[in-house]
Amino acid sequence: MLGTSTKCSKRDCNYAKENISRIMPTIGLGYKQNFEKKTADTQSSCKLLLVALLESFCKHSDQTPEQSKQMFLYVAHSLQNSGIIDFEFSEELEPIRNAYADSLHNLLSKAFRSTLPMSSTKDSKKSRYSSPDGVLAKTASFLSVLSDGGYEDDVMNVKPSVNVLSNRLNHLPVEALESCFPQTTLESSTFADFCEHKDGTGNLSFSNFDSFPTVQRSRYASDFEELELLGKGGYGSVYKARNKFDGVEYALKKIPLRLRSFSTSSNIFRESRTLARLNHPNVIRFFSSWVELLPSSEKQIEEEPLASADETLSQSADIDNFMFDMDTGLLQHTYPSSVQILFQEDSVADDLTPCYSTKNSTCNLTDLFKKEADQDYAESHDCSSTTSQVDTLGKLAPTKSASEMLLMDSFLSEREEDECSNIPSFDQQPLCLYIQMALCEETLEKHINRRNKHIHGVMSKGLRNCYILLFARILEGVLYLHDAMHLVHRDLKPRNIFLSSGVHSEPCSVCLPNFSDEDNVEVSNAYEPVNQRTLCVVPKIGDFGLVLSQSDNLEEGTNSSAESSFVGTSTYAAPELFSKHMRSVMNNNSSTDIYALGILFFELLYPFNTRMERASAIANLKKGIFPHDFLDSMPEEASLIRSMLSSSNKRPTAAQLLTSNLFHDLVVNELHVYQALLEDAEKRNNNLKAELNILRVLNPNYDC
C-alpha cells in the first residue's frame, strides 16, 4: 500500500518521478537503446507471425499450390503498400514463417491438452457450467468427448499435433458440437468455413485442419551423419559431418535461435549471405544454409545459450571475457542487455566456459532508491506512513514516459510473475540455422602452437620466408574482401584462418614445416627441429559471423548491434574500437582489419615460449616496442608491422601492403622459399649423417 494520506501519496509520486529523472540520465542511453531495440524486434515478430498465418490460410485454400502462392503474394503486397508489413513475405524468410506457424500449432496443441484434466467427471462439469468461465467450461465439455476411449494415453505417446484432434473429429456428429455451443452454428463460423467438409453421412471432417503446414523433416538428420564437435564460436558450434549421399565430410555450423528475436533487419543470416557471395581461393568455401526446428530429442544444443538475432555471445573456449559499460565505464561480470563492449580474450583452457546471466552485478536501482529513500525521508515530518515507498513503486499512478515504464516494469509483483510462468512461451522450441562449409580441421592457431613447442625466438631465414609467403596469401584474401566485396571481417586472428591441404601446383598454396604434437623435440642451434616434414596448405579466411559491409551507415538506426556494442577479440582489436565515440564510425572501416593483421604477422614471425611471454610481447608491440632480436634480424618486417599498428588514417591498405618491398615479387619470393626449404632439407640430412657417423664410432657393432 501507499501512504495513509493523500498528501503522502502525492509526495510519493513526485519523489519517484524525481528519482527517475535523476537516475535515468546516468543509465538512460543503454536502457533507451535496449528498449527501442526490443520494441522494434517485437513489432517485426508480430509482422512475421501475421504473414505466417496469412500464408497458412492461403495454403489451406482449394487452389493449386501455384494459385495459393499467387494469392498469398497478392495479399502480402497489398499489406505492404498499406504499411502494415515490410518484406516479411520474401522467399528467404519462408523457413522462418513455417517455424512461426509450427510453433503456433504446437502452442494450440498444448492449450488443447491443458483443458483435458478439467473434464474428468460429470460433477466437475456441472460446477464449471455455473462458473463465470462458462465458455471455457463448455469447451472442456466438448473436449471431454475426445478424451473418451483412451485419448489421454494417445496424447502421451504422440507428438503434439492437430492431426490427433482431426482423427477424433472425423466421425463426430455436428449435433455433439452444437450442444456444447448452442449460441453459434458451425456453418456460420469463419473457422468452420475454413476447415469444414462433410461426408455423405453428414459427419464433420476436418481434412484441411489435418493438413496443417509444419516445418519439413530435419534435413540435417536425414542427409548428414554427425561425426564430432570441431569447436564453438561466438554464435554457435561447428561439427564435422559426413553427407550420406556423396560421402564427403563437411563442416556444419549450428546457430541456435529464438523465434521472437527474428526481424527483417536481423543480422543472424549475415554470415551465410556473405559466404554465398564469396569466391576466392583464400576464403572458406560455402555450400548451403537452411533453417529448421530443433528436434525435441536433440538436447545438446537446447541446453546451450540461444543466440538472438542481433546479439553475439562470445562463449567459445575463452576464459577471459570482459564487458565494459559504455556510459559508466564499470566492469560487468555478467551479460546484461544494456549498452556494452564485449571482448573475447584468447583461450586458456578448452574446458572452461563462462557462465551467463541476464542480471547485472553492479548498481541495483532498487537498492539505490532504497538508500535515497532512507536518507531523504528520515528528515521528513509530513508523511505518517512507514511503508517502504520502494516496495510500492510499481503501484503508483500510471505514467506516460518510456523511461518510467522501463522502471515500473522491473517491479512486477510476484503474483503476476507466478501467473505468467504457468503459460508456456510461444517460441519454446528453438530454431537452428545450419551453414554447410568446406571442412578444414587445421587452423593457423593450432599450427603456431605446435611450432612454438619446437622453435623459440628468431627463426631461420628459410622458415621466415615460408611464413611471409603465407601472410601474403592471407593478404590476398583480405584484399578480395576489402576491394572486391567491400566487406570488413572484424575478427581476423589465427583461429579464424584455416589451413586446407593442397599440392605444390595448386594456386595460392604454401609449403610449411609439419611440426609434430610432441613437446620434447630436439632443437638445433639454428632453431630447426631435427625431425620434420613439409606440407602444402592453402590458407583460407573463415568465420564471417561479425562481417560488415563498408557501405553500412552505423550512425543510422538504433537496432544495429554494431552501434550498441562491439564484439571481437581484444588482443587483435584496434584501439579506436575501445572508444564509444569512435566505434560507430570505425567499426566497418577496413583499417581495423589491417591492425589485426599486424598482430597476426608478428605472431607468425616470432615464436613464444609461454602464453605469458606472448601476452607481454603483444602488449609491448601495441606500444611500439619490439623485441631486440626481432629488430636486429627483421628490420623490414618490423617497419611494416609498425605501419600496420599506427593510427587508423595512416595504416596501409591490403593492396599497398602487397606492393611493398617485402611482397613486391611473389613469384621470385616463392622461388626463394622453395630454395630455402631445399637448403634446410639438405642441412638436416647432413646433420643426420653426422649423427649416424657418431653412433658408428661409439658402437662399432651398430648396424644401420
Curated annotation (Swiss-Prot):
Q: Which residues does the entry assign to the active site, renumbered to this chain? A: 491 (proton acceptor)
Top-rank taxon: Eukaryota
Tell me, using the record's free text, what induces this protein: By heat shock and arsenic.
List the InterPro entries hit by this protein, alphabetically: CC_SR_Kinase, HRI2_3H, Kinase-like_dom_sf, Prot_kinase_dom, Protein_kinase_ATP_BS, Ser/Thr_kinase_AS
Modifications after synthesis and translation: Autophosphorylated.
Q: Name one GO cellular component term.
A: nucleus
Please provide, alphabetically and separated by semicolons, the GO molecular function terms listed in this UniProt record: ATP binding; eukaryotic translation initiation factor 2alpha kinase activity; protein serine kinase activity
One GO term of the biological process aspect: negative regulation of cytoplasmic translational initiation in response to stress
The record's section on SUPFAM superfamilies has: Protein kinase-like (PK-like) (SSF56112)
Question: Where does the signal peptide begin and end?
Answer: none
Q: Which residues bind ATP?
A: 230-238, 253
The yes or no answer to whether the keyword Disulfide bond is present is no
Supply the enzyme class, top level. transferase
Locate the Protein kinase domain: which residues?
Answer: 224-667
UniProt keywords, alphabetically? ATP-binding, Kinase, Nucleotide-binding, Phosphoprotein, Protein synthesis inhibitor, Serine/threonine-protein kinase, Stress response, Transferase
Enzymatic reactions: L-seryl-[protein] + ATP = O-phospho-L-seryl-[protein] + ADP + H(+); L-threonyl-[protein] + ATP = O-phospho-L-threonyl-[protein] + ADP + H(+)
Enzyme Commission (EC) number: 2.7.11.1
Regarding protein family, the annotation reads: Belongs to the protein kinase superfamily. Ser/Thr protein kinase family. GCN2 subfamily.
What is the recorded function of this protein according to its Swiss-Prot or TrEMBL entry? Mediates down-regulation of protein synthesis in response to stress conditions by the phosphorylation of the alpha subunit of eIF-2 (tif211) on 'Ser-52'. Protein synthesis is inhibited at the level of initiation. Activity is inhibited in the presence of heme.
Protein name, as recorded:
Eukaryotic translation initiation factor 2-alpha kinase 1
Q: What is the lineage of its organism?
A: Eukaryota, Fungi, Dikarya, Ascomycota, Taphrinomycotina
